[in-house]
Amino acid sequence: YPLETIDSNVIGLRKLLDLSLEFNPEGILFFSTSEIYGNPDSDNIPTKETYFGNVNSFGPRASYDESKRLSETLCYIYNDKFELPINIVRPFNNYGPGLNINDGRVIPDFFKNILENKDIEIYSDGTSTRTFCYISDAITGYLLALLSKDKGEVYNIGNDVPEISMSNLANLIIDISNSKSKVVYKTNEDIHYLTNNPQR
């Protein structure tokens, strides 16, 4: 739903910000995404909030990444022009209870394979790495960002370490599940696969 994604992230947010001007809120927290960074080069990993990004505007996930980038610009304008007290958070790979098994992220995908008695399929050589942030830790970060007296700021919410490879993550999930599943490595013909998904 690329057009609906753009409408929700941009037009929906604009309407919400306009409405907020009538109520003089003490604070607004906008949830952006780490995907606005695109594919940082090795000099920008871990990725700082000041990194402008390296995003592909032409691909299947571009509507999400680019609409979030434009949404951040809207937040900046409303803070700068109208002094609306907005802060922005960019979540990195949160996980924990309540994660939808069908949401397409790596941890639920791996568990879904196991629950269906299937092997875990990794569409790479398994060496790519990620860091993960437990949801209660992320919520602490979100709350601190919301309550901060400094407004018009951007905060990455995630962990710098430890990194884990997709291969090791798959084997860890197999081990803690006492599963007989195996890890199977495949290639993906989609050139956009694993893009715009910063490590940390």
Can you describe what each PLM-predicted range is?
Residues 1, 98-102, 195-197:
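Short, solvent-exposed loop/turn segments at secondary-structure boundaries
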Residues 1-94, 136:
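N-terminal Rossmann-like NAD(P)+-binding domain of SDR-like oxidoreductases, especially those catalyzing
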Residues 17, 76, 108-112, 143:
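Solvent-exposed, non-membrane alpha-helical residues enriched in polar/charged side chains
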Residues 33, 43, 106, 110, ...:
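Activation loop
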Residues 43, 59, 99-103, 162:
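Residue-level signature of the cytosolic catalytic core of signaling kinases
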Residues 48, 93, 112-200:
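C-terminal substrate-binding subdomain of Rossmann-fold SDR/epimerase-dehydratase oxidoreductases
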Residues 63, 71, 103, 166, ...:
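Conserved donor sugar-nucleotide recognition element shared by glycan-biosynthetic enzymes
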Residues 70, 74, 78, 110, ...:
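Hydrophobic alpha-helix immediately C-terminal to the catalytic Tyr-X-X-X-Lys motif of short-chain
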